[in-house]
């Protein structure tokens, strides 16, 4: 006899979002790309680590490109066609992520750099000596 109970899962709501926002967080160690609707609700997201890149490979331009493509494809399935892009962080994946978005056929309406700049806040990490 099979007495295992099936897990109850919510069905994903298909919604049509023609325009939205794309937030690219490009740090030195990883790249996170989030696609949202105009209200800020997440439509899709992806990151280099989520796609199987490990360690120092997560911060590479190629990893950023793959992450942006993945997030854009998921968003296009939800009907997204155009985005406002918000960039944050000093990472190497900034430019490749934007190029990958454009290459998937997503229309980029605007580009904004929202990298937080301290008014001389915390002391930065010491320089690496290799």
Swiss-Prot record:
Pfam families referenced in this protein's UniProt entry, alphabetically: Ribosomal_S11
Classify the source by domain of life: Bacteria
Annotated Gene Ontology cellular component terms: ribonucleoprotein complex; ribosome
* Record's keyword terms, sorted: Ribonucleoprotein, Ribosomal protein, RNA-binding, rRNA-binding
Ribosomal protein among keywords: yes
One Gene Ontology BP term is:
translation
The terms under GO molecular function for this entry are: rRNA binding; structural constituent of ribosome
In terms of InterPro entries, this protein maps to:
Ribosomal_uS11, Ribosomal_uS11_bac-type, Ribosomal_uS11_CS, Ribosomal_uS11_sf
Entry keyword annotation includes DNA-binding: no
Question: What SUPFAM superfamilies does its record include?
Answer: Translational machinery components
What NCBIfam families is this protein classified in?
A: PRK05309.1, uS11_bact
* Family designation: Belongs to the universal ribosomal protein uS11 family.
Q: How does it assemble?
A: Part of the 30S ribosomal subunit. Interacts with proteins S7 and S18. Binds to IF-3.
Q: What does this protein do?
A: Located on the platform of the 30S subunit, it bridges several disparate RNA helices of the 16S rRNA. Forms part of the Shine-Dalgarno cleft in the 70S ribosome.
Q: What PANTHER family does this protein's entry cite?
A: 40S RIBOSOMAL PROTEIN S14/30S RIBOSOMAL PROTEIN S11
Name the UniProt record assigns to this protein? Small ribosomal subunit protein uS11
Q: Which organism is it from?
A: Bdellovibrio bacteriovorus (strain ATCC 15356 / DSM 50701 / NCIMB 9529 / HD100)
């Amino acid at each position: 006899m099979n007495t295992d109970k099936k897990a109850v899962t919510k069905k994903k709501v298909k919604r049509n979002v023609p325009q939205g926002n794309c937030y690219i967080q490009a740090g030195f160690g990883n790249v996170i790309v989030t696609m949202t609707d105009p209200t800020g609700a997440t439509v899709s997201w992806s990151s280099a680590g989520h796609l199987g890149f490990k360690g120092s490979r997560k911060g590479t331009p190629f990893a950023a490109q793959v992450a942006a493509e993945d997030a854009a494809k998921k968003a296009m399935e939800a009907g997204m066609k155009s985005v406002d892009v918000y960039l944050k962080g000093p990472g190497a994946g900034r430019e490749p992520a934007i190029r990958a978005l454009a290459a998937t056929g997503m229309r980029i309406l605007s580009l904004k750099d929202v990298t937080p700049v301290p008014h001389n806040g915390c002391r930065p990490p010491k320089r690496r000596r290799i």
